[in-house]
Amino acid sequence: MKFYTIKLPKFLGGIVRAMLGSFRKD
């Protein structure tokens, strides 16, 4: 997952991180 985050733009990485966090919380 880290690889994808690093490759993707910063704003995109933030969105993905937020989505992942939401799923984890759920």
UniProtKB/Swiss-Prot annotation:
Origin superkingdom: Bacteria
Annotated disulfide bonds: none
Practical applications: Nanomolar concentrations inhibit biofilm formation in situ, in S.aureus and in P.aeruginosa, suggesting it might be useful controlling bacterial infections.
Tell me the GO BP annotations in alphabetical order.
sporulation resulting in formation of a cellular spore
Q: What induces this protein's gene, according to its Swiss-Prot or TrEMBL record?
A: Expressed during sporulation and is regulated by the mother cell-specific transcription factors sigma E and SpoIIID. There is a lag-phase of approximately 2 hours between the onset of transcription and translation. The 5' untranslated region negatively influences its own translation.
Predominant subcellular localization, coarse grouping: membrane
**Is the keyword RNA-binding in the record?**
no
The Swiss-Prot or TrEMBL note on domains reads: Residues in the N-terminal region are required for proper localization.
The record's function comment reads: Coordinates cortex and coat assembly during sporulation. Associates with the spore coat protein SpoIVA and with the outer forespore membrane, thereby serving as a membrane anchor that tethers SpoIVA and the entire spore coat to the forespore surface. May also serve as a competitive inhibitor of FtsH activity during sporulation.
Spell out the protein name for this chain.
Stage V sporulation protein M
Which organism was this protein described from? Answer: Bacillus subtilis (strain 168)
